[in-house]
Amino acid sequence: LAWVWLPQAQPLSSQRISEQLAVVDQSLMDRYFKRRHDRLLKARQKVSAADIPQFLALDSTSISTYSETIASAAYGHARQDPHLRQVNLSLGVDYETGDVCYAYESEGSTNDKQLYLAIVQRMIDHQFDLSNTVLVTDRGYHSLMNMQKLINLELKFVQGVTRAEDSVRRLFDQHRVSLDDPAFTDGRLEVAA
């Protein structure tokens, strides 16, 4: 697809890519994505009279590298190529538009649970308006500490949890009838309340 959108563009060498990445630091990325996020919220307000929250899906991936110049590359928990160092890339994506609203690059040995609060705190520190945003994560980000911090910050969130936790399993069993009742289902979001 690159030749369709950028017909005159030539692929960059790995050396040139490393040089370009060396001048982009996280604070530049934070400022850039703050502007993107603000633009998206303004566009949402113009289109929707209702105060519908933004759903911001957060997820991370590890990228393996042979590079010796990437400072944040570290040995992590790679399933593929465990002999290579890796870098974590976390993205915040607007559910409705698919726009990337935030990106965070971190050391490859950091797991999602540790990363979650760092990402949220960076967004808060850079004045991201999260007042009408629901943060959505998978179970890899779940910990009681993370949940309590989000509650303390008065942030809205949906977080996957492993059913292996006895307390969660008991709650599912206790409320099974209500969860299966169509009256408690939001058809638009396809979730049970």
Tell me what each language-model feature is.
Residues L1-A193:
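Conserved, well-structured functional cores that handle cations and Mg-NTP chemistry
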